[in-house]
Each structure stands twice: as structure tokens, then as C-alpha cells.
């Protein structure tokens, strides 16, 4: 019996050590099954009927709109007025639903969630992304500065009204405790409730985690893009939130100040890296998928991202190992014929060719390096290596009919291409797969080991029975 089980135990130990040294597996992709998806979540549906400017969005894996009145979409955004009784202060400083979370009513809030979720996501299948966009206050006390300081002020006033004899430092300490406790309860219970209503969807909060690396404004010459240590530590304080999420939705909207500079890539890179760190560190069973919000234009204007900044946003997010990017925008993109025409030109000439290139490059890397069971991630996060189709190996050709892809690659990976991928990228395997190239099926391996163990035990038992019969006879 020992001789029969020895190799099995040794193999099990070897597999356990090998699997433990890998990246924590990540959730498999949804939608198209691609390792990197690109979604269009911009309300441009009026360009064709209102302005006679149809937009071809076939190159995007997902098309949705954040506007009110659209249901059963692959991406659903729940703003504060679409999901329960979110406590906040309005633009005039008036309290809404209690103002601060400790003044809100979870008992009234939670029963309203089911109706809201079922209104916007009317079926359990197919799986999709569900993004809660609550930006009025932040659950970490010290992050409520500038216009959000009203939440700290109101919290202090609530405590002072109950304890007028307390010193100010005690009031602040108690106010912080009450605010953070209530904020945690509101966010956690909301997540748990909506996940129970639509468990197949991937749920998370927009702009979580954040990195607060906007100091390029004050420190342009010395700007590195790194997340301040204090912000990383405060993100770790939100471990309770990351453990409940099923996806993360950081944002990398670019200010025009960053256009065509090395700082744009640094700004994006460290924000995505921080999200990936949180995704890997604070979730028990697997690394959470990270979907990065971006915009087709710079913030607060309609100037389109140039090629360099597309690489800094989409390309950087793909190379670091995010699950995809989500282009977000508001109704201004379709507010006039001129805006629609400009957007159509940008899509056709710049954006679509680039996203097709990156989408297929990530797919080829997954197929050739990870057996299609994982996505490629940079070996060195800071390296200037990207998942791009080589122009010497591929060209993009348009589809011949409306049913065909808008653009598709024509060509094949060369030996140099394969060497480049192997040298600069490694695999991040999906749940159930392991090994350097995601070649091991964990479930199958576990089943084989169990069957081998059972077979060895059965053989030993049969041998014992045979011996017993021999002695009896």
C-alpha cells in the first residue's frame, strides 16, 4: 500500500507547491469569452435617428447606455437616484434621505433594492456588469475633503447635539466612528442584497479602488504617478468592501493637462496596478476581475484621445492584466449633428482600429501562451511592452457584409512574435486552471488524484481480502 500511494502523495505535493507559487486565479471572462473586452457605454443611440449619423459599434464586445429608460443591458449603472434611499446632500446643501449615512434608514432602504434591480436587470441570465455609482461621500472619513467635507461637518454636529459637554477631539472621534460604521453598513448590506437578487452579475462600486494620484497639477516635474502610501493603506482599510465585491471598477479618465505626455501613462498605470493589487490581495478564493472605466475624450471637453493616450489607457490596462475597459460618456456626445459626425470620424479612423488591434493581440496571447485558459500580464509592470499586433505579421481588413466583424486581423504570429510574448508576458489563469501556461485542469487533476487514491485503497483492500480468504481456507 505504501509503495502504491507514495508517487500519488508526491505528485499531490508537487502540484500543491506549484499551484501555490502562481498568481491567485481570476474569474473567467464573461460576454464573448475574450480575455480583454472593450465596452461602449455612451448614450449615442440618438445619432442615427435624430441627426442621420449612424455609428458602427460592431467592434465593441458590449454596447450599452447609462441613460434612464434602458433595461436588460449587459452593463447596468445604478446612480444614487436609481437604487434605494441613498443618504446624501444635494447641490443646494439640503439633506436627502438623512444626509449622512448614520442618519439614513437601512430598514427603509433595503426593501426598495429588489424592485430597482429587477426593473433594470429583468432576467437572471445572461451575466453582466452591475456598477453602483455612489460618489457623494466616501466610506473612509479622511477622504471626505473639499465639497465632501459637509459629511464630516454634519457628523460632528450630530454628535455635538447629543453631547454638548464633550470636548471637540472626543466629538470628532465619535463622529468618525459613527460615520464610517454607518457607511460600511450601507455599502455592505446594499452589495449583499443586490447580489442575492442577481447573483450571476458582477457587482462593484464605480471608482473603487481609487489611488488619488492627481498631484501632477502641483508637481509636474517630479510627478511619478505612484499612489501615495497613505492611500494604499486606506484602501487596505476597505478590505471589508473588496471581500464582498465581485468586480472592481477603477477610473482612468484623463485630464487634457496629461495629453501626449509620459505622465498620462504613469497616471493610468499606477491606478490600474492598485486595483489589481486590491483584486488579488483582498478576495479569498480568487482575484477579482478589474474593468477600467475610461472616456473617448479628455475630461470636461470633447477633444478625442490621441493615439499615444489610447495606448496609455487601453493598451496599458490590457498589458497589466485587466479584464477590460468600459468607455463611458454622457448625452453631450450625441447632442448635435457635428458631435455625432466628429465621433463617427474618430471611431472609424482611430478608436476602432486600435481596440481591434489590442483585443485580438490579447486573444492571440491567451491562445498561444495560456492555452486559452488565462490572460497575459506583463512580467514587469513598469516595462514599455504592450499587447499589439505586429504590423509585419498582421493587417486589419474590413468586413465584407454587415454580419461580419467591422475589422478583423489577417495574418499569423511569427516566431519573433511568439518569442516576444513569452519573454515579456506571463499567464494569469482563470479559476480551475493552473500551471505556467494554464495547462493544468485543477478539477480534473483533483479527480484523477482522488480516483488513483481510491484505486490504490481498493487494490489494498482486495489484497487483504484475498489474504484473509487464503488463511481461512
Curated annotation (Swiss-Prot):
Intrachain disulfide bonds: 47-340, 211-227, 365-376, 370-427, 429-438
Transmembrane segments: none
Localization per Swiss-Prot or TrEMBL: Cell membrane
Propeptide: 449-473
Enzyme class: hydrolase
The EGF-like domain, residue ranges: 361-439
Lipidation (GPI-anchor amidated aspartate): 448
InterPro entries associated with the record: Aldolase_TIM (IPR013785), Glycoside_hydrolase_SF (IPR017853), Hyaluronidase (IPR018155)
Keywords of this entry: Cell membrane, Disulfide bond, EGF-like domain, Glycoprotein, Glycosidase, GPI-anchor, Hydrolase, Lipoprotein, Membrane, Receptor, Signal
EC number: 3.2.1.35
Known catalytic reactions: Random hydrolysis of (1->4)-linkages between N-acetyl-beta-D-glucosamine and D-glucuronate residues in hyaluronate
Subunit text: Interacts with MST1R.
Family the UniProt entry places it in: Belongs to the glycosyl hydrolase 56 family.
Name of the molecule in the record: Hyaluronidase-2
Species: Rattus norvegicus
Taxonomic lineage: Eukaryota, Metazoa, Chordata, Craniata, Vertebrata
Encoding gene per record: Hyal2
